[in-house]
């Protein structure tokens, strides 16, 4: 049964995911050691996570691994709940590990891991809100997470354009669209107020 990659139990999928993440961090360390650091794109809140990473490198690496693990677990659990596969499997968890560790290109892995965690949380909240009528709190939280992403990681600004598309595709009401828009804009107001 060990050769069947689709039907691996949760502990095996979790172990595979953690091995992929550790290999990605070793690859990033070797690449940075010999080729130099690839600078990250600057963002208002990304500056603080980059400063934390420089001050506490081991703690930020551990926090990054934990954030990637939580995001992978959320993605794996969501794929089981949404019945994406014909059989109950946790294949999405190692696949998320491969994709997410391919994204970790710059030296600012803490910011990118936090961005992936926010994206997984936003996806989970959107998924839960679209299966219920008038679920304003989850719509707001999902949009709030998406609104935080460009403040942490500037290339994530394109995700803000997906909110109106998602609201239209899932035929949400105008009230839910206003809640989603206010959730996405609220972090920008706070960042503008602080800076």
Residue ranges and their predicted role:
Residues 23, 179-195:
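Membrane-lumen/periplasm interface segments of specific transmembrane helices
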Residues 1-18, 85:
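N-terminal membrane topogenic signal
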Residues 66-82:
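Transmembrane-helix motifs of polytopic, lipid-linked glycan transferases
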Residues 159-185:
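Perimembrane helix-loop-helix junctions
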Residues 79-99, 117:
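Transmembrane-helix signature of polytopic, membrane-embedded enzymes
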Residues 122-137:
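Membrane-interface transmembrane helices that cradle and orient dolichyl/undecaprenyl
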Residues 138-152:
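Membrane-interface alpha helices of multi-pass inner-membrane proteins
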């Amino acid at each position: 049964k060990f050769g069947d990659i689709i039907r691996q139990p949760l502990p095996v999928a979790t172990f595979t995911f953690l091995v992929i993440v550790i290999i990605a961090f070793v690859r990033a360390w070797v690449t940075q050691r010999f080729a130099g650091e690839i600078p990250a794109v600057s963002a208002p809140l990304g500056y603080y996570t980059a400063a934390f990473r420089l001050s506490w490198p081991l703690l930020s690496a551990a926090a990054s691994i934990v954030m990637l693990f939580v995001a992978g677990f959320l993605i794996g659990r969501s794929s089981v709940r949404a019945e994406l596969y014909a059989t109950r499997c946790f294949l999405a968890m190692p696949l998320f590990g491969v994709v997410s560790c391919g994204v970790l290109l710059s030296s600012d892995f803490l910011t990118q891991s936090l961005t992936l965690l926010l994206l997984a949380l936003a996806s989970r909240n959107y998924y839960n809100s679209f299966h219920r009528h008038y679920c304003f709190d989850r719509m707001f939280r999902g949009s709030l997470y998406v609104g935080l992403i460009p403040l942490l990681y500037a290339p994530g600004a394109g995700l803000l354009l997906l909110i109106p598309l998602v609201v239209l595709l899932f035929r949400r009401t105008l009230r839910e669209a206003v809640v989603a828009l206010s959730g996405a804009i609220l972090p920008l107001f706070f960042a503008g107020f602080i800076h």
